[in-house]
Design a protein with these regions (language model features):
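Conserved helix-loop functional segments at active or binding sites
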Residues: 1, 50, 54
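Short, glycine/acidic-rich hinge or "gate" loops at secondary-structure transitions
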Residues: 1-10
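Sequence/fold signature of self-assembling virion shell proteins
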Residues: 15-18, 22-50, 63-66, 72-175
Length: 175
């Protein structure tokens, strides 16, 4: 699957409706998982801006900055983030996605390795996703004495984790 629901340091999955804070919780995923469209993207932008809280329950300055999509949702991402007028209508209303909460300043990115064709994510301006490069990629080679073939090998150790779930908002619809 695209999403690994293993629990993090706060005892819940990375994208959860119940991240614990002092006496309450906050969500970085919709209560009901939703497909990507104009309304759900606007709701995500507003939810990030209004619902993200710190450990004391105080509002933090959080804004969506980049949309992460599987290849199947790239056309939807283009329509939502690249049009000046409201997508999918004959109205000449402005595209609110481009202005709400500062818009999506870094646009979208297509991740070819997401295995769900429907899940989508919004990275925020808050640091919290971690890539730990424990041993950088190294290669070695030698010529096989018997066959005269060139033998090569590569080795690397790394891991991914998170330390602040406010770094991402995600939705995982099944269709």
């Amino acid at each position: 699957t695209t999403y690994n629901s293993n629990v993090g340091g706060d005892g819940v999955a990375l994208c959860s409706t119940a991240h614990p804070i002092d006496g309450s919780t906050y969500a970085n995923t919709p209560t009901t998982q939703v497909d990507l469209n104009e309304a759900t993207l606007l709701n995500a932008q507003i939810s990030i801006r209004t619902n993200f809280r710190d450990q004391a329950g105080l509002k933090v300055f959080a804004r969506g900055k980049k949309l992460i999509l599987p290849p199947a949702l790239e056309p939807v991402g283009i329509r939502l983030t690249k049009t000046e007028l409201r997508p999918g209508t004959a109205d000449n209303d402005v595209n609110a996605i481009l202005s709400t909460a500062g818009g999506i300043p870094e646009g979208y990115m297509v991740m070819d390795f997401l295995t769900s064709s429907f899940a989508w994510y919004m990275l925020t301006n808050i640091a919290g996703l971690a890539y730990m490069n424990r041993i950088p990629f190294e290669t070695d080679m030698q010529v096989d004495f018997v066959t005269d073939n060139l033998l090569t090998k590569g080795y690397q150790r790394f891991s991914y984790n998170y330390f602040n779930p406010r770094a991402i908002f995600g939705s995982f619809p099944t269709s």
